[in-house]
UniProtKB/Swiss-Prot annotation:
The modification Phosphoserine is found at S1209, S1225, S1432, S1463, S1465, S1466. One of its GO terms (cellular component) is glutamatergic synapse. The gene is Neo1. It comes from Mus musculus. Residues 63-158, 163-249, 254-347, 352-437 form the Ig-like C2-type domain. SUPFAM superfamilies: Fibronectin type III, Immunoglobulin. Residues 1072-1128, 1205-1237, 1266-1300, 1321-1396 are annotated as: Disordered. This is Neogenin.
Amino acid sequence: MAAEREAGRLLCTSSSRRCCPPPPLLLLLPLLLLLGRPASGAAATKSGSPPQSAGASVRTFTPFYFLVEPVDTLSVRGSSVILNCSAYSEPSPNIEWKKDGTFLNLESDDRRQLLPDGSLFISNVVHSKHNKPDEGFYQCVATVDNLGTIVSRTAKLTVAGLPRFTSQPEPSSVYVGNSAILNCEVNADLVPFVRWEQNRQPLLLDDRIVKLPSGTLVISNATEGDGGLYRCIVESGGPPKFSDEAELKVLQDPEEIVDLVFLMRPSSMMKVTGQSAVLPCVVSGLPAPVVRWMKNEEVLDTESSGRLVLLAGGCLEISDVTEDDAGTYFCIADNGNKTVEAQAELTVQVPPGFLKQPANIYAHESMDIVFECEVTGKPTPTVKWVKNGDVVIPSDYFKIVKEHNLQVLGLVKSDEGFYQCIAENDVGNAQAGAQLIILEHDVAIPTLPPTSLTSATTDHLAPATTGPLPSAPRDVVASLVSTRFIKLTWRTPASDPHGDNLTYSVFYTKEGVARERVENTSQPGEMQVTIQNLMPATVYIFKVMAQNKHGSGESSAPLRVETQPEVQLPGPAPNIRAYATSPTSITVTWETPLSGNGEIQNYKLYYMEKGTDKEQDIDVSSHSYTINGLKKYTEYSFRVVAYNKHGPGVSTQDVAVRTLSDVPSAAPQNLSLEVRNSKSIVIHWQPPSSTTQNGQITGYKIRYRKASRKSDVTETLVTGTQLSQLIEGLDRGTEYNFRVAALTVNGTGPATDWLSAETFESDLDETRVPEVPSSLHVRPLVTSIVVSWTPPENQNIVVRGYAIGYGIGSPHAQTIKVDYKQRYYTIENLDPSSHYVITLKAFNNVGEGIPLYESAVTRPHTDTSEVDLFVINAPYTPVPDPTPMMPPVGVQASILSHDTIRITWADNSLPKHQKITDSRYYTVRWKTNIPANTKYKNANATTLSYLVTGLKPNTLYEFSVMVTKGRRSSTWSMTAHGATFELVPTSPPKDVTVVSKEGKPRTIIVNWQPPSEANGKITGYIIYYSTDVNAEIHDWVIEPVVGNRLTHQIQELTLDTPYYFKIQARNSKGMGPMSEAVQFRTPKADSSDKMPNDQALGSAGKGSRLPDLGSDYKPPMSGSNSPHGSPTSPLDSNMLLVIIVSVGVITIVVVVVIAVFCTRRTTSHQKKKRAACKSVNGSHKYKGNCKDVKPPDLWIHHERLELKPIDKSPDPNPVMTDTPIPRNSQDITPVDNSMDSNIHQRRNSYRGHESEDSMSTLAGRRGMRPKMMMPFDSQPPQPVISAHPIHSLDNPHHHFHSSSLASPARSHLYHPSSPWPIGTSMSLSDRANSTESVRNTPSTDTMPASSSQTCCTDHQDPEGATSSSYLASSQEEDSGQSLPTAHVRPSHPLKSFAVPAIPPPGPPLYDPALPSTPLLSQQALNHHIHSVKTASIGTLGRSRPPMPVVVPSAPEVQETTRMLEDSESSYEPDELTKEMAHLEGLMKDLNAITTA
């Protein structure tokens, strides 16, 4: 069918000449149809059949390229133009032309015609002001039918306009032997058509007379024959255009010096590689100057270099410009009396070129390929891709990767053709192409897969051999579905149950899209694949195919999976604009996003200075904002993000804008003066720093004057690129002051300080080095040596300064240069008692002179007589200690950034204006107190402020200042403190560990430590986790955690799955780096797990879900479907069912018989026992007569009456309370899954980020203690039961009845609807949370019936109803209560009460090996247990939720409910009176116990 569709596509109409095949090809169509049928065998290969055409031939790549491409052309109106183009292919291609992107209809065009070689011929070019049909961009298009199309580079045809003179020649004069210029500037297109005439005769050009590219005429070494009338003529196809005539007069040599003057300065220009550049430089003057050129401080050789030629007048011509020719060129003219110089910048641009061209590619359908294209050029070229002549628009399947490469995903047959990479910049464009051939699936790729094939798509390219093919993979499921990735798992095919040597290919496509993609497993036997880079909320169709050495097998049934939707976030804000409003402010405007996905709450405006990586943000509620306080003339980038209730949306594109320029805010730098001779001084300087220029420097203003106060100031302006100036015409032996200021278009900035220099008395000789200084004297002190000298005796040689060298034993260790006027210098910071060698040399521009040597030994520390150079004291005269100076005051620390603090202070010893006029200096010291042993750091300053840098972020420092003047120093000032600003964390959280939670394989616990370089208070953490470590970070799942926590639980993970975890810390400044990925594999499912979130398969009941048993789990199957071929016998299954039902029926019958027997026996002795034992009917079960009955233990019943005090206790015998112990996890039935799931959801919504077992900050840092169950065994003669409820921390053995909890709004207990016994245990934790009790409440149908102890009840209600003890607590108890309470749960409707009690003495016994263990005294262990009571132990003064206790024996639910109803209706008035009497007696006993 594919061949038939291909043949049908060839049958096109004759009107479409681009797609019609030649007649011989039409004759082959029947043959193509026959040959095309086996092509369906490729499709059959996917369905499990062996290949049908393995030996099919492979098509070869077709040579198809341009021999000649059009180039940019300049033409004039009315002329003819040929745009060359020629392409090679077999068969010959069809050539067409495009103009400005539209095909030209050459058949009906009279002026344009296609030449046989493919070139375009345009006759009689038309061009006018309003009609320019021929000017534009032309492109040649070559097409080979049934093969493809390629396009040439784009060529620009420019038609010159009407000639217009912007400047014309003017009358001038020139001395014989000098130079002259005559201007003639026209529009740039017509410069090649300019010629000159002298006296109406064509002017012949030679080495002495040249025409510059601008049209200007330069005449050098003028002669008398050069005089006359000159005019320039423009001939551009129409009538010639003449300029004005100008007369050039040639004057005789005046025999006097004429100052050098620039007739034409060099100007900066831009050229393209391969072109010629002419840098003009014409200087006139007498004597005639000699012009030389320099580049980057190197003299250019214009004599022997073939590319560098010096033209007439001194102009420099550079032929065949290369990128290395770019730079700054200096033109220097010198005539022996004067030197002038000028400079210009040459910028070289490079057309696009290819470092790596696309390569031809073979591929199969559904594969992914990449065409590589690496380009170069200046400016950096942009790249676009063209397929068969049409521009490729990036989409989901055509993507631009690595800036220039084209990636095609999920190839289809129609993707075949020619692909071209087109690179373009301001100075040109270029193209390079490659061919893509898509082979049938049964045709192997003939060569090794090139690097442009993705690694996941080349595994099935080897030719298949004969043999059985695998069947379809089984049980293909999506085990993990996210917004942008899906994880698929499957089982081996039935034909190969082991499948160790099978590889798998996953074919997938977006629903409704025919383009299919493929992803292969990474190794044989692997049965899972994660498909990345999917679209959110999109349906994808997946099919899995197994492959063995014989080929591809059957495909699995299509699996339809929809990715998760992303949160509905706002789209980008449209029409963002930014414009500068002042040198320090920029206004940004935007509009409401088109897809806001709800109400936009606010916007966040991000901006960043260009060249930095620190982005700042501002919250904005409107659609515009003006940012102030920006740097002047600085480029900033801006972007806007809209926020709705879901969070931040899509960011806009960055827009860049520069603040307006301003006058410079700082003076030029490094001002220096060089005295050339007796009448000139050269000034050198550097521009202000880039941050203070505030705009483009357009020039410099030089002001100078004589040192005398009343002298006039002279100003000189120079260009912005000039950094030195020669000032001439000065007086001999006179001191001058100079200062320089920078200029922008906005004005003049601040000037430098005045700098002085004195001209020489006479013009001295500087053709040789100075002579040796006439004398050298040294004066050693303790840590310094004073050096003095006299100048050389020969005063006729220029001395520009002195070089002092010194060192211990050698004078070459250090060198200091001083001014030529200086006669002494103090070398400081020397070592005491050390031998120093000192040398002194005079120097000038030629070099250094002969050195003069001297040596000296510094004085020891004990010698304090540091004598001034000009004051002679006795060598041993003691010098008194100097008076200390006053310390600086008002020390302040101003925080500037995270690592910089400015220290300022005042000096009371200075005048009021605080101006330093002497040699004092200040020492600043600083340190931080963390750690405590930190040493001080010091720095010296000569001003009243100092900038301390290199500090640590978010750190408190203390600063103090000391002043020193000569030998006098002050004490340290009072300290000032300053804390640096915070900075984003610069290190990730450390010690990241992941462990599985015990008993909950779906829950893991992540632990970590704070970053070592937090740089501020950590406000939170973000935990990232994913099953793919290579996934993009935005595809990872995130879990936010508050900053004071160092552990977090993650629940509901997939079993037996590797997860990768990363953690990122944040503070107020932003997010820090991520930690390295930590891998953790969740455990496999365990059938003994009874956790609500990880049940075994056999315990999944109604409302529960099956667990994830991992990708390797194979469920048992019956009969022939069993993977191992071992069928299960139906007889065994039926027998097992009969046994289970029989055991259940027998158990129920036994329980009912025992309950009836106990009820009847209790009824016959009820009244007698009550009168004899004075005991209320309760949950205690007694065996024996009255003498065995224990005294009252306050577990009593009453009816709507409050307790009254008791005077005494009727029986001093001790009472013990015991609690049964479940010995293993099977003794307690787990809670119902559906109930736990619901409660779990409510808990999560209530607790926020805390997990179900999270503890308080203090409790969470210490280990958990095992839970305990504690009975009471009273030892003293007057026993007291101390009972108080305490909350347990999520023990899996704790189960609470939903109806056994007291309502928070009531202070009385009420009857449960189903009074079942409840098992509990005690925890030593001090945390209480009522929500935990609710969370652990099971349903009534899952409560166990204990079989550990069974007895008959001796004390019953009048109707014989058996009751159980329950324990509850009121949440309205007085918060100031300081004693524990024993809460009583009656079996008939009487109110509960609380009595103060004292905890029992005696240490308990504790066995940590059991899940929950009773604490019994030795006496209680030896005593036969007659009764079981329930109680909870807790901490004094705290209110805890109730913890019910399991009673060993319990009736069925229905029977117990009936007994309770009978019990409630069996009370008569006389019995109530008797009961009240008992109650009053017990109150008296209670008073006696508590007061004893």
